A protein has these predicted regions:
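Glycine-rich phosphate-binding loop signature in dinucleotide/nucleotide-binding domains
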Residues: 55-57, 109-116, 180-184
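Short, acidic/turn-prone active-site loops that include or flank metal/cofactor-
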Residues: 87-94, 141-147
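Short, acidic loop-to-helix structural element flanking the phosphoryl-transfer center
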Residues: 11-12, 16, 20-61, 71, ...
């Protein structure tokens, strides 16, 4: 069983209040039809998740954003059900939630070896934690504004963090799925 910890939310440096104002405005535009799901996600991300589901992968979502907000956004965008492994987010107490803790819990609860864990993320923390347990780490070095294309600064950071594969988006879904499931 290959499990995946997948990050759809991109790292954005705003205060929580500013971030939630922006999210609320965008959710209002989504509900009114001014925006569509693809305006919120990286190119090919949702198709990639469904391709993994077809392979029987249990998928988790972990974010540094408050858990209730992550769940609300996933439900509003219509992809919450994809995350059958659970949706994790900040609970306001670092002793009760961290990406490291989420990875450890997933491994323990599913009796996994690290090599059965695939982490896809845009931050050095999740990449480093994945590599510490010998997991497979894919770094997303994306241009967050366009939601596709390569960000060289992120690429360098992710490589230094231990990412084994770097992608800029999920536009090559089938090739990435084939690579992940190639027997070594």
């Amino acid at each position: 069983l290959l499990d995946i910890l997948f990050y759809l939310r991109q790292s954005i440096t705003y205060t929580d209040k500013d971030l939630m104002k922006m999210v609320d405005k965008r959710m209002t535009k989504l509900k009114s039809g001014q925006l569509i799901v693809q305006d919120f996600t990286m190119k090919g991300a949702v198709d990639f998740l469904y391709a993994l589901k077809e392979k029987g992968v249990r998928i988790y979502l972990a974010s540094g954003t408050d858990k209730a907000d992550v769940i609300n956004e996933a439900e509003s965008l219509g992809y919450a059900a994809i995350f059958d492994g659970g949706i994790y987010g900040s609970v306001g107490d670092i002793s009760k939630y961290s990406k490291k803790m989420v990875l450890e819990d997933i491994i323990r609860e599913n009796n996994l070896k690290g090599s059965e864990m695939l982490v896809i993320g845009d931050g050095p923390v999740e990449i480093k934690e994945c590599r510490k347990v010998n997991g497979i780490a894919i770094g997303i070095a994306s241009d967050e504004v366009r939601r596709y294309g390569l960000n060289q600064e992120k690429r360098s950071r992710l490589i230094k963090s231990g990412a084994q594969i770097i992608i800029s988006d999920f536009s090559q879904t089938q090739e990435l799925v084939d690579l992940i499931f190639t027997k070594r």
